[in-house]
Design a protein with these regions (language model features):
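Surface-exposed acidic/polar loop and edge beta-strand patches at domain peripheries
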Residues: 1-127
Length: 127
């Protein structure tokens, strides 16, 4: 088994980028950008399995805005809704709240036998 590691000391387009990797895979997460997984790379093939929007660079969104105007690619958390909706008098944005909010994070285990990154966010609208 190859060594695993977490490197929290990267920045990409002025966003913190936390890189998790082992001998086979590399993932890049933006905690400030809804814990977006921006890269998921098979290292042997140098193949990123996540699409990047050629027209939009990663940037901090404004809460409640249209997801499509901010989507730079990658893999986003879209809890708790898929469309704009109202529940118990509260209006939820398109594709939810979590994609546009900064998440707290900590490295639980930095490697080399195991690497574990813990990310957490409380919603603003949803109970």
């Amino acid at each position: 088994m190859s060594a695993a590691r977490i490197d929290p000391n990267w920045r990409y387009h002025d966003l913190r980028a936390v890189v998790l990797e082992n001998g086979r895979l590399r993932a890049t997460v933006f905690p400030e950008l809804g814990a977006k997984i921006y890269d998921f790379v098979l290292k042997a093939a140098d193949r990123n399995f996540l699409w990047h929007n050629p027209r939009l660079e990663p940037r901090l969104p404004v809460f409640g805005q249209n997801f499509d105007d901010w989507w730079c690619g990658g893999w986003d958390e879209v809890f708790p809704t898929c469309d704009v909706s109202t529940y118990r008098g509260d209006t939820y944005p398109y594709l939810g709240e979590l994609w546009s909010l900064p998440w707290s994070w900590r490295v639980e285990e930095p490697g080399p036998s195991r690497a574990c990154l813990y990310l957490e966010r409380t919603t603003v609208i949803a109970p």
